[in-house]
Amino acid sequence: MSRLVDDFFAFLHVERGMSAHTLDAYRRDIGALIAWGVQQAVGEVVALDRAQLQAFVAAEHRRGLSAKSLQRRLSACRGFYAWLVKRGHIAINPAAGLRAPKALRKLPRILDADEAVSFVQIPTDTPLGLRDRALLELFYSSGLRLSELCGLRWGGVDLDAGLVSVLGKGSRQRVVPVGSYALSALREWCASSGGGAQQPVFPGRYGGPISARAVQVRIKQLAQRQGMAKHVHPHMLRHSFASHLLESSGDLRGVQELLGHADITTTQIYTHLDFQYLSKVYDAAHPRARRKAR
């Protein structure tokens, strides 16, 4: 059994290009299923039927696992059984069609346009300031994922065309435009840092790509230094990019392409943010909004 599980994770890593973070989550999910099977003495997980999987989901739910975590756990199980079917180890996928309780989707927190512009406009009178300005401007200008920004090398930056080429989820390559302010900041940082094609745009302490944790800590420090009340984190800049772009353009499909979302339903969360903003405008401005009739 352990060999099959190892082979499955090798498939996810090599053929599906799954990140180490996602692989760890999947290992926990499949591990939970195996542990439940042992505890219930129901045999090997390859032999579980649909009713037993439903019992597993119910047990996890009773244990207090959130709806979102349950959905991911079921997704891992579906993928595992689908792989077993494809390899001929079992005849049918017992997890196909199984559903977890629906998760309440939280709306992402964003900076408004004025907050975002104020935040990224930090002084550039030191090399560190040049780097930080370029990093923040690029985040907000192009809506990159944290992993994409950390892995970016100068060879993937076309300062003349105003484009960056990044490796997204599932090892999918995409090209995204860079705004004029971010381009200006990148040019200054390139001139200061050297900018060799194979060099990371944002190097870490030892010359390799900067770590995700280092970026998170730095953004938190910069936000605190500016006295911002909100807890600012890298993904908030990506959320802000998407929301502001959708608000001004209304082009959901275009925003999907720029963000690198494989499924447009992932992008649709930003339409709810836009509606939330419009609702606030209505409540504040309309003479009949939320007022008791006299």
Swiss-Prot record:
Keyword presence, Acetylation: no
GO annotations of cellular component type: cytoplasm
Species per Swiss-Prot/TrEMBL record: Xylella fastidiosa (strain 9a5c)
Gene Ontology molecular function: DNA binding; tyrosine-based site-specific recombinase activity
Family: Belongs to the 'phage' integrase family. XerC subfamily.
InterPro entries for this protein: CB, DNA_brk_join_enz, Integrase-like_cat_sf, Integrase_catalytic, Integrase_recombinase_N, Integrase_SAM-like_N, Recomb_XerC, Tyrosine_recombinase_XerC/XerD
Function: Site-specific tyrosine recombinase, which acts by catalyzing the cutting and rejoining of the recombining DNA molecules. The XerC-XerD complex is essential to convert dimers of the bacterial chromosome into monomers to permit their segregation at cell division. It also contributes to the segregational stability of plasmids.
Gene: xerC
NCBIfam families in the cross-refs: PRK00283.1, recomb_XerC
Lineage, broadest ranks: Bacteria, Pseudomonadati, Pseudomonadota, Gammaproteobacteria, Lysobacterales
GO biological process, one term: chromosome segregation
UniProt subcellular location: Cytoplasm
Active-site residue numbers: 145, 169, 235, 238, 261, 270 (o-(3'-phospho-dna)-tyrosine intermediate)
Protein name as annotated: Tyrosine recombinase XerC
